[in-house]
Curated annotation (Swiss-Prot):
Protein name: Putative phosphoglycerate kinase
Organism listed in the record: Pinus strobus (Eastern white pine)
Miscellaneous comment text of the record: On the 2D-gel the determined pI of this protein is: 5.3, its MW is: 22.1 kDa.
Keywords: ATP-binding, Kinase, Nucleotide-binding, Transferase
GO molecular function: ATP binding; phosphoglycerate kinase activity
Keyword Transferase attached: yes
S-S pairs: none
Family the UniProt entry places it in: Belongs to the phosphoglycerate kinase family.
Catalytic reactions of this protein: (2R)-3-phosphoglycerate + ATP = (2R)-3-phospho-glyceroyl phosphate + ADP
Cofactor(s) recorded in Swiss-Prot or TrEMBL: Mg(2+)
Lineage: Eukaryota, Viridiplantae, Streptophyta, Embryophyta, Tracheophyta
Length: 27
């Protein structure tokens, strides 16, 4: 369970980073 949660958190973090990059590029 802990490992699964960590993976989800990592994926979520990467998703947020991608969103930030997209926002910067769109500006």
């Amino acid at each position: 369970f802990a490992v699964g949660t960590e993976s989800i958190a990592k994926t979520f973090s990467e998703a947020l980073d991608t969103t930030k990059i997209s926002d910067v590029l769109s500006k």
